[in-house]
Amino acid sequence: EKENENMARVKSQKSQKRRKAFVRFLPIYILMLPGLIYLFINNYMPLPGLVIAFKQYNAGKGIYGSPWVGLKNFEYLFTTSDAFVITRNTILYNVAFIVINTTLAIAVAIILSELEGKRKKVYQSAILLPNLLSTVIIGYLVFAFFSVENGFINNTILKALGKDPVSWHSEPKYWPFILTFLRIWKGMGYGMVIYLATITGIDPSLYEAAVMDGATKWQQTKHITMPCIKPVLIMMLILDAGKIFYSDFGLFYQATGGIPASLYNVASTFDTYIYKAIQSSAPIGKTAAASFFQSVCCCATILLTNWLVKKVDEDSAII
């Protein structure tokens, strides 16, 4: 009986602790609630619709009443001439974005960490501001700069240099550089803030000891800053690798003015392909197959990247 009483007392104490912990963290749970609802609605509720990729979807029969076609929708995706173009563009653009964006974000964060006072906050805000801009606004900015008749570059810069105006939207050779610049300009501020916060959290005594030993700024960066931000850097790279088959639809579609035929080979990605396929009344099963393939590739990429990281440094892996 005493043992039963002791067990009951222990259980009662544990339940009380749980209740106290729940009440203590209730404000945090409430703050999490909108995000969890958004995640559930946008990421989990659509999951049953994955079967559309394997069906000849008929709106009248519904998702589960439509006939199965197996992998025929995927066959269509891989046999079309667009498959190579959209896969190549999506991967190459994302690799360029990750490498350049990460390098510049770390470099700018290190430079800003050396500044003090109002200048630091001004530079931080200026670099982060483009990240807050809508891609629609960026599309209008691109039009203002690259319009053939009224664009700033043609009417001001090229005119002053005595050069003929350029029909930018008819010249695909320029757009890999334009799109890369726009993506870095828009996205670098986010990474910079994360790396700057990590650098700010490094123990100042490490730098003080390095200065006393006569270490240069480069040596401090190499032997103190970089090792300290390494876990965050690896985590960011793994998360970026998970999005390597996704593209910024707004950037590619809005900045190019809807991807005209002249820019199709340099600006088409998985996301723009799916959108245009839906617009052209293509069978929903085929567009669902493209989206499903995209998701599977992203999942495989993040697992592969995490596995490689675990082989090199197990503590830095996120799974």
Predicted regions and their residues:
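A structural signal for multi-pass alpha-helical bundles of membrane permease subunits
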Residues: 20-319
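Short, Lys/Arg-rich, polar N-terminal cytosolic tail immediately upstream
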Residues: 1-22
